């Protein structure tokens, strides 16, 4: 299980139900990493997508509400059980905060883009501090994505 997100200097990941920035190199990297994989998100993340479903990926939503337009599950346990039964080899959790909180302890790898901004109006934060991440994960690579962002890849220790 992989978690993938971008955050600002304070751990901010969302503003008004959307990404608070538009960094093309980060979006390209997200696409490259998640293409031809299964992606899992919460209902709010699903609703914020400009294109539904994200193309060339199996889209799954975790929601307590009925979601007839997309494969969805109402609990983490049901979701994990079904994906295991389907033989899903790689799962990318793409948001939001509640879904990250439910999967961080199950994650094998993290893909974090650090955005060099202190964004105004952030209302959603990644639910785990970088200090806690560093206790459980080891950074194995770092790539500059232009002037505004740095992509990092972490594996569980």
For the regions a language model picked out, list residue spans one by one.
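Enzymes that bind and transform nitrogen-containing heteroaromatic metabolites
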Residues: 1-157
């Amino acid at each position: 299980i992989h978690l993938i997100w971008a955050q600002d200097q304070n751990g901010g990941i969302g503003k008004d139900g959307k990404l608070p920035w538009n960094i093309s190199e980060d979006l390209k990297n997200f696409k490259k990493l998640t293409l031809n994989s299964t992606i899992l998100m919460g209902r709010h993340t699903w609703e914020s997508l400009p294109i539904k479903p994200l193309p060339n990926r199996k889209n799954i939503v975790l929601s307590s509400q009925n979601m007839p337009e997309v494969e969805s599950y109402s609990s983490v346990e049901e979701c994990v059980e079904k994906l295991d039964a389907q033989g899903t080899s790689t799962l990318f959790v793409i948001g939001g905060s509640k879904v990250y909180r439910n999967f961080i302890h199950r994650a094998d790898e993290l893909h974090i883009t650090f955005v060099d901004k202190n964004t105004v109006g952030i209302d959603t934060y990644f639910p785990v501090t970088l200090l806690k991440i560093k206790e459980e994960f080891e950074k194995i690579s770092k790539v500059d994505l232009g002037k505004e962002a740095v992509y990092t890849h972490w594996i569980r220790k």
